[in-house]
C-alpha cells in the first residue's frame, strides 16, 4: 500500500496546481 502513496500524492498535487 505504501508504494501507492506517492502516486496518490502526485495526483492530488496535480489537481491542486490545476
Curated annotation (Swiss-Prot):
Alphabetical keyword list: Amphibian defense peptide, Antimicrobial, Immunity, Innate immunity, Secreted
GO cellular component, one term: extracellular region
UniProt-annotated location(s): Secreted
Major localisation: secreted
Tissues/organs with expression: Expressed by the skin glands.
Coiled coil ranges: none
GO terms, biological process: innate immune response
PTM summary: One shorter peptide due to unspecific cleavage of this peptide has also been identified.
Functional summary from the UniProt entry: Antimicrobial peptide with low activity against Leishmania species (L.amazonensis and L.infantum). Shows low cytotoxicity against mammalian cells in models of peritoneal macrophages.
Protein family according to the UniProt entry: Belongs to the frog skin active peptide (FSAP) family. Phylloseptin subfamily.
Name assigned to this protein: Phylloseptin-N2
Native source organism of the sequence: Pithecopus nordestinus
Lineage: Eukaryota, Metazoa, Chordata, Craniata, Vertebrata
Amino acid at each position: 500500500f505504501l508504494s501507492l502513496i506517492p502516486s496518490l500524492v502526485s495526483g492530488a498535487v496535480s489537481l491542486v496546481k490545476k
